[in-house]
């Protein structure tokens, strides 16, 4: 197909992440020439399956797997240079050209080893104090965003000025080592193998961190860019851009199940702020949602099933869907589709259309349940309340629909789906009020049903 020129699409997750955004971004880049990451860090994980080969990405936009597509890391991303180069080297070993196609905003805050140390120590302190863990990945994302908001972060651009970088690094280390040792008790904490080289007596050591940062600085310089300017110039030249969200709406720091959320805004509106373009450049918002729900880590999950019990629908979802986190390897909790939560996601993102992924995972279930609202304090509500405390008290209200025994794996024609699968999808559209434009029927990029293409949709 020939896409409309100068049209830009935003892809966002509508659940708690892990919806299959990577595959759809990869599929959509046949119509785009640039892909942009605008928030998060290497806590996000995208798995692509191309010709049967799996590739896991954490920082680099999924468009890197399409030859000739330019990839951008916007200012809204917190960047671990160490993890970035691990990813680059892995792709290069697989024959993928990265460095000439990757542009990194000079305004990206840096994730440094002390951020990960604080992240891990805080979660350990919560557990030791009897509180439920937030469920962070322990990769320093939250502490790095804290430094950004407190206006003390070291940014990519600082790497171009070694003396300034060193002075500010010393200041940051004094602050964060004080937090680690006096408040979090890091002197008695056993850090993992990845952090041990940086830490002595519970303190992160300046010399090791500084030397590594200076090595990364030389490697990063050719990729540093004014990403905002380049994206605006690309748009004026009629280039199609794709903005790739990480995690999901229900993990958004403002609109998610607070405090069990990430530290950035995962919603579509942040595609503008997190990359340096105006909101008028965002033409279509595609919401990605699984045909059921999953969640990694702590926090409320109204439709959660006994997914660890063999023979149950939740166990079927976990097993057939291979529900383990790309970044952490943790098992994902599984449950029925929550259309009420999706309505909230549609509201805060302004969704133009939906892509339903992993429809094939539901093959073989005799019946399906669809949450259309909740009961809270004796009243029926059709949207989730704000905040985890009230969501925990919500009881889901379900509709039961018949399942299907036929296989949907690899189907690329909507008319060839089982009748009950089509009814299930139609009911999701009716309850949420958002049209389904795409359906994924396996992890393979080509196993996609298209009803309306985001780059052609009006």
Swiss-Prot record:
Annotated InterPro entries: Adenylosuccin_syn_GTP-bd, Adenylosuccin_syn_Lys_AS, Adenylosuccinate_synth_dom1, Adenylosuccinate_synth_dom2, Adenylosuccinate_synth_dom3, Adenylosuccinate_synthetase, P-loop_NTPase
Cellular component aspect of the GO annotation: cytoplasm
Entry-linked SUPFAM superfamilies: P-loop containing nucleoside triphosphate hydrolases (SSF52540)
Cofactor(s) demanded: Mg(2+)
Assembly and binders: Homodimer.
Catalytically driven reaction(s): IMP + L-aspartate + GTP = N(6)-(1,2-dicarboxyethyl)-AMP + GDP + phosphate + 2 H(+)
Function text: Plays an important role in the de novo pathway of purine nucleotide biosynthesis. Catalyzes the first committed step in the biosynthesis of AMP from IMP.
Pfam family, one: Adenylsucc_synt
The protein's name: Adenylosuccinate synthetase
Top-level EC class: ligase
Active site, UniProt feature: 18, 46
HAMAP family hit by this protein: Adenylosucc_synth (MF_00011)
Pathway info: Purine metabolism; AMP biosynthesis via de novo pathway; AMP from IMP: step 1/2
Gene transcribed to yield this protein: purA
The keyword DNA repair appears for this protein: no
Organism: Verminephrobacter eiseniae (strain EF01-2)
Sites where the protein binds IMP: 18-21, 43-46, 137, 151, 247, 262, 330
Enzyme Commission numbers on file: 6.3.4.4
Annotated GTP binding sites: 17-23, 45-47, 332, 358-360, 440-442
Family stated for the protein in its record: Belongs to the adenylosuccinate synthetase family.
Residues the record lists as binding substrate: 326-332
PROSITE patterns in alphabetical order: ADENYLOSUCCIN_SYN_1 (PS01266), ADENYLOSUCCIN_SYN_2 (PS00513)
Biological-process GO terms, alphabetical: 'de novo' AMP biosynthetic process; IMP metabolic process
Cell location: Cytoplasm
């Amino acid at each position: 197909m020939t896409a409309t020129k100068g049209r830009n699409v935003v892809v966002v997750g509508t659940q708690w992440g892990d919806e299959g955004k990577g595959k759809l971004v990869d599929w959509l880049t046949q119509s785009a020439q640039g892909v942009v990451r605008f928030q998060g860090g290497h806590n996000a994980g995208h798995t692509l399956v191309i010709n049967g080969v799996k590739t896991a990405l954490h920082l680099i936009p999924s468009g890197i797997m399409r030859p000739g597509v330019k990839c951008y890391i916007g200012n809204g991303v917190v960047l671990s240079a160490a993890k970035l180069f691990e990813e680059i080297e892995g792709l290069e070993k697989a024959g993928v050209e990265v460095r000439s196609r990757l542009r990194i905003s000079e305004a990206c805050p840096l994730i440094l080893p002390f951020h990960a140390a604080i992240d891990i120590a805080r979660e350990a302190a919560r557990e030791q104090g009897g509180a439920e863990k937030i469920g962070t990945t322990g990769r320093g994302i939250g502490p790095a965003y804290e430094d950004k908001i407190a206006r003390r972060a070291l940014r990519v651009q600082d790497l171009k000025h070694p003396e300034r970088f060193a002075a500010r690094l010393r200041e940051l280390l004094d602050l964060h080592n004080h937090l680690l040792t006096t408040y979090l008790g890091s002197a008695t904490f056993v850090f993992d193998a990845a952090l041990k080289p940086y830490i002595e007596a519970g303190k992160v050591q300046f010399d090791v961190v500084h030397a590594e940062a200076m090595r990364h600085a030389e490697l990063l310089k050719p990729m540093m860019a004014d990403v905002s300017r380049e994206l605006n110039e690309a748009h004026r030249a009629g280039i199609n851009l794709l903005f790739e969200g990480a995690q999901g709406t229900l993990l958004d720091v403002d609109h998610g199940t607070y405090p069990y959320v990430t530290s950035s805004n995962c919603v579509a509106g942040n595609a503008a702020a997190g990359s340096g373009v105006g909101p008028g450049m965002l033409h279509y918002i595609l919401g990605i949602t699984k045909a059921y729900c999953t969640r990694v880590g702590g926090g409320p999950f109204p439709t959660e099933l006994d997914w660890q019990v063999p023979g149950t629908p939740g166990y079927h979802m976990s097993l057939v869907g291979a529900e383990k986190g790309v970044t952490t390897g943790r098992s994902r909790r599984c449950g029925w589709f929550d259309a009420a939560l999706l309505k909230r996601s549609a509201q805060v993102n302004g969704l133009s259309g939906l892509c339903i992924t992993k429809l094939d995972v539901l093959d073989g279930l005799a019946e399906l349940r669809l949450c259309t609202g909740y009961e809270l304090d004796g009243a029926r509500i059709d949207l989730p309340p704000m905040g985890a405390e009230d969501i925990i008290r919500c009881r889901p209200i379900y509709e039961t629909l018949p399942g299907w025994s036929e296989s949907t794996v690899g189907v690329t024609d909507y008319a060839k789906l089982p009748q009950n699968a089509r009814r299930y999808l139609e009911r999701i559209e009716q309850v949420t009020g958002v049209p389904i434009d795409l359906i994924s029927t396996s992890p393979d990029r080509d196993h996609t049903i298209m009803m309306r293409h985001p780059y052609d949709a009006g």
